[in-house]
């Protein structure tokens, strides 16, 4: 029999409904797995007491025939989502000891639908990173290893804890956020599925902000179906978030059976970047063949402003971050380091509380927003953003239903391998993903194969605004063709 923590979310849902096992049993199985996997450092804090109490409530609901959509399903929550009464850190020392008096909209909707909270998942500090190495609470280690090697690998970032926990069977699914690829890149690195919905599909209320015009919540899970189930509960209009869009939430799970017959898939020629590994190119070609064999038409398209996306993103995102992070000053909550006066306290608190990468991005953002450089950098970057959005609009207007690209330019790299590199080398991990955020579009990463060293590689599908259903249909087609990627033996247990 499959261990309870190794079931897919859909299998666990069906098993709970059939009363094959209890919500308490599956919660305990995950808590035991979390305890055995401390070497991965996927969780900043586990919440076993809360998990078992929530599971007991779920068992009562199931016994009464009142099961809700996610009844009894154990989930992990990225520690960027405010959770009432539970330590919420954003992976930063500056929020040490912070326990919110409120719940994020996304997590409250998951609890409304009966999900069980296992704990808070590790992440790059304030979601700024692509490797989960910038967390003040230690690096998260990927459960994957290269064949014949003990070198610890990064799980990707910023949602590295979410991706690692899902891949290592430490939760059935997890919440995550994506500002420039922070759901899709770690999903690709860990052989999991991650969807960044359309901007405005999920409420940002109660999510600690990085770049407000780019941030979007979404799920990471082990299958396309599981992601569809979770997004159905996470999505929805929230009047407390002015960027939340009031559109109906479709049945995402039903969309996975649609298939791709009659769809037109675009292959952007600008994504064939210099130095792309041959195995990434082969996988991309294979993905196009799978979709073609399933009945889709595949044709080349042009997104001419792609080359400017990464530099524009790394102007817009730090600019918004420098504004958003100005609120952390040690006055109301979190870390406080005394100074000679109030200004000294601000300086000391921020100097001690923020990590190196966060400070770098605050400084970049402050610089590009300064009087002498605002027009030269920030205004130009916003103009590029508009041109990127128009490129996608033109592609979809020409009859394209979805766009297929690689999810990442490589497989996962080793912990510390980028430590001495130019920061721009790390930023290049987002080369295939940032355009989606700049244009506010939905994008999904689905596992499609392994590299020569046995590490997972993902393909990305990009859709029209608020057409996640087509992405789920196409992603399911790729998952069916590629087969489920199995995690290697648990070396950490």
From Swiss-Prot:
Keyword Cell division: no
Signal sequence annotation: none
Active site, renumbered: 78 (charge relay system), 158 (charge relay system), 182 (acyl-ester intermediate)
Gene Ontology CC annotation, any one: glutamyl-tRNA(Gln) amidotransferase complex
This enzyme's EC code(s): 6.3.5.7
UniProtKB keywords: ATP-binding, Ligase, Nucleotide-binding, Protein biosynthesis
Pfam family, one: Amidase
UniProt xrefs under HAMAP family: GatA
Function: Allows the formation of correctly charged Gln-tRNA(Gln) through the transamidation of misacylated Glu-tRNA(Gln) in organisms which lack glutaminyl-tRNA synthetase. The reaction takes place in the presence of glutamine and ATP through an activated gamma-phospho-Glu-tRNA(Gln).
Xref: NCBIfam families: gatA
Family: Belongs to the amidase family. GatA subfamily.
The protein, known as: Glutamyl-tRNA(Gln) amidotransferase subunit A
Source organism of the structure: Methylorubrum populi (strain ATCC BAA-705 / NCIMB 13946 / BJ001)
């Amino acid at each position: 029999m499959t261990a309870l923590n190794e079931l897919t979310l859909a299998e666990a849902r069906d098993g709970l409904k059939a009363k094959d096992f209890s919500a308490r049993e599956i919660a305990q199985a995950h808590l035991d797995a979390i305890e055995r996997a401390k070497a991965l450092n996927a969780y900043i804090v586990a919440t076993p007491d809360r998990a078992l109490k929530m599971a007991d409530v779920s068992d009562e609901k199931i016994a009464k025939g009142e099961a809700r959509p996610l009844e009894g399903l154990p989930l992990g929550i990225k520690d960027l989502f405010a959770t009432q009464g539970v330590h919420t850190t954003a992976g930063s020392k500056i929020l040490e000891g912070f326990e919110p008096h409120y719940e994020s909209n996304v997590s409250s909707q998951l609890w409304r639908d009966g999900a069980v909270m296992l704990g808070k998942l590790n992440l790059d500090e304030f979601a700024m990173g692509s490797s989960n190495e910038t967390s003040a609470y230690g690096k998260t280690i990927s459960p994957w290893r290269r064949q014949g090697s003990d070198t610890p690998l990064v799980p990707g970032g910023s949602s590295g804890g979410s991706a690692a926990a899902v891949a290592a069977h430490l939760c059935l699914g997890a919440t995550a956020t994506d500002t420039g690829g922070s759901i899709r890149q770690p999903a690709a690195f860990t052989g999991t599925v991650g969807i960044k919905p359309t901007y405005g599909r999920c409420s940002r209320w109660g999510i600690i902000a990085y770049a407000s015009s780019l941030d979007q919540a979404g799920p990471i899970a082990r299958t396309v179906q599981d992601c569809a189930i979770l997004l159905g509960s996470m999505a929805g209009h929230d009047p407390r978030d002015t960027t939340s869009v009031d559109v109906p939430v479709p049945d995402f799970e039903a969309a996975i059976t649609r298939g791709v017959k009659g769809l037109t898939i675009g292959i952007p020629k600008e994504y064939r970047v210099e130095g792309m590994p041959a195995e990434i190119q082969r996988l991309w070609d294979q993905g196009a063949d799978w979709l073609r064999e399933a009945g889709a038409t595949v044709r080349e398209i042009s997104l001419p402003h792609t080359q400017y996306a990464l530099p524009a993103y790394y102007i817009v995102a730090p600019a918004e971050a420098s504004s958003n992070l100005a609120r952390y000053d040690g006055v109301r909550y979190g870390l406080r380091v005394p100074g000679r006066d109030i200004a000294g306290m601000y300086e000391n608190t921020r100097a001690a509380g923020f990590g190196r990468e966060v400070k770098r991005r605050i400084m970049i953002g402050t610089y590009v927003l300064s009087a002498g450089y605002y027009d030269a950098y920030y205004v130009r970057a916003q103009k590029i953003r508009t041109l990127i959005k128009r490129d996608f609009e033109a592609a979809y207007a020409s009859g394209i239903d979805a766009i297929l690209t690689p999810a990442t330019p490589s497989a996962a790299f080793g912990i510390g391998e980028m430590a001495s590199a130019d920061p721009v080398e790390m930023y290049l991990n987002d080369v295939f993903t940032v355009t989606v955020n700049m244009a506010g579009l939905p994008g999904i990463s689905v596992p499609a194969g392994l590299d020569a060293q046995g590490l997972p590689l993902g393909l990305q599908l990009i859709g029209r605004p608020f057409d996640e259903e087509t992405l789920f249909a196409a992603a399911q087609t790729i998952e069916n063709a590629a087969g489920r990627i199995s995690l290697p033996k648990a070396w950490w247990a």
